[in-house]
Amino acid sequence: MREIVHLQTGQCGNQIGAAFWQTISGEHGLDSNGVYNGTSELQLERMSVYFNERSGNKYVPRAVLVDLEPGTMDAVRAGPFGQLFRPDNFVFGQSGAGNNWAKGHYTEGAELVDQVLDVVRREAEGCDCLQGFQITHSLGGGTGAGMGTLLISKIREEFPDRMMATFSVVPSPKVSDTVVEPYNATLSVHQLVENSDETFCIDNEALYDICMRTLKLSNPSYGDLNYLVSAVMSGVTTCLRFPGQLNSDLRKLAVNMVPFPRLHFFMVGFAPLTSRGAHSFRAVSVPELTQQMFDPKNMMAASDFRNGRYLTCSAIFRGRVAMKEVEDQMRNVQNKNSSYFVEWIPNNIQTALCAIPPRGLTMSSTFIGNSTSIQELFKRVGEQFTAMFRRKAFLHWYTGEGMDEMEFTEAESNMNDLVSEYQQYQDAGIDEEEEEYEEELPEGEE
């Protein structure tokens, strides 16, 4: 079976990760100790993608939990699903990274990284045919951002031909918990552009908006936000966990979604959105799902796709859905919103179906879009970065850990390049492409 090893780093990564494991354990009929008491054969069929089978019908997640301070880990261990994880897979330091990317990437994190890699290696060896890794982390902090990206590059070195998917929580414009977020995020994006194969961008502010606007929660907790993220993660990984007809692994997803290797930052959405307690009180139909799924208010990254164009996108429908109806709806969406799709990639929407809906719903859909409007997100971080970096504010925290200003300049220009690449493909039309191509031919020296 095509296994995936899951890593969660830092406070944010561990909390999202814990919510994710809680969600998929439920979908696979496992209780909080990992004992199977489900009802359907389908739950067992591809269980091994995320779980190792132990004796006595008990399943253990292929998860590695990493943090530079023990606090969050203890919380996970004491939480409802704390007994699920293998105790040796908790790897933590004592000092904390203090929201400092350099500590996570170069000093504190670098000391812990070998220990983590040992655990990763052990998990990888227990796999039949490892398909890749997924990592949950935030880009604004120290451990998730600094050490998370360090782990990604180390794993890249050791498993160069395996997929690397990241679920990255990007700093949001209004909700910020540390002043150095723009630094940490820019340095992380600089790493992700080079080392990750697919990055699902999640944004706290967009999640707050969804909670307040759509779910009508007056003051959402992180628990509510993580619940939304875990719904999307569960949706994105559906095809990997249940027998489906399309898009059954990370590599296929990447091949269909990434037209140019650097442009692998996706926005995600989920429908139907229901708050944690109130599972849908009405029947959902495919047209409704499709409409809600393509609604800008449903995107979990704070960038509006109406300001850009989709290079590619993928929709995953779950539940008892008629294939024909889905195809009609998707064609419909593409015809109505044709201006939001680039015309030089024909058929750039693809759909996947899975017969098993999430718990408590009859059907649901998950949306993954590679839109050029994601550049808004990088632009925003870039502006904040520049404002601080011009004055060299807070820089001593980083140089004190042995970093060089040069690295900041590099990261900044790499991110600016990324933004202009997105812009270039947003503006490109069919006819221009051909003209450019003809102009470039005579030189042929590259």
Swiss-Prot record:
GO terms for biological process: microtubule-based process; response to antibiotic. Residues 421-446 are annotated as: Disordered. Changing residue 50 to N: In benomyl-resistant strain. GO terms for molecular function: GTP binding; GTPase activity; metal ion binding; structural constituent of cytoskeleton. Mg(2+) binds at residue 69. InterPro entries: Beta-tubulin_BS, Beta_tubulin, Tub_FtsZ_C, Tubulin, Tubulin/FtsZ-like_C, Tubulin/FtsZ_2-layer-sand-dom, Tubulin/FtsZ_GTPase_sf, Tubulin_C. Its cofactor is Mg(2+). Keywords: Antibiotic resistance, Cytoplasm, Cytoskeleton, GTP-binding, Magnesium, Metal-binding, Microtubule, Nucleotide-binding. Residues 429-446 have a biased composition (Acidic residues). GTP binds at residues 11, 69, 138, 142-144, 204, 226. The keyword GTP-binding applies. GO terms for cellular component: cytoplasm; microtubule. It comes from the Eukaryota. It is found in: Cytoplasm, Cytoskeleton. Dimer of alpha and beta chains. A typical microtubule is a hollow water-filled tube with an outer diameter of 25 nm and an inner diameter of 15 nM. Alpha-beta heterodimers associate head-to-tail to form protofilaments running lengthwise along the microtubule wall with the beta-tubulin subunit facing the microtubule plus end conferring a structural polarity. Microtubules usually have 13 protofilaments but different protofilament numbers can be found in some organisms and specialized cells. Belongs to the tubulin family. Tubulin is the major constituent of microtubules, a cylinder consisting of laterally associated linear protofilaments composed of alpha- and beta-tubulin heterodimers. Microtubules grow by the addition of GTP-tubulin dimers to the microtubule end, where a stabilizing cap forms. Below the cap, tubulin dimers are in GDP-bound state, owing to GTPase activity of alpha-tubulin. This is Tubulin beta chain. It comes from Fusarium fujikuroi.
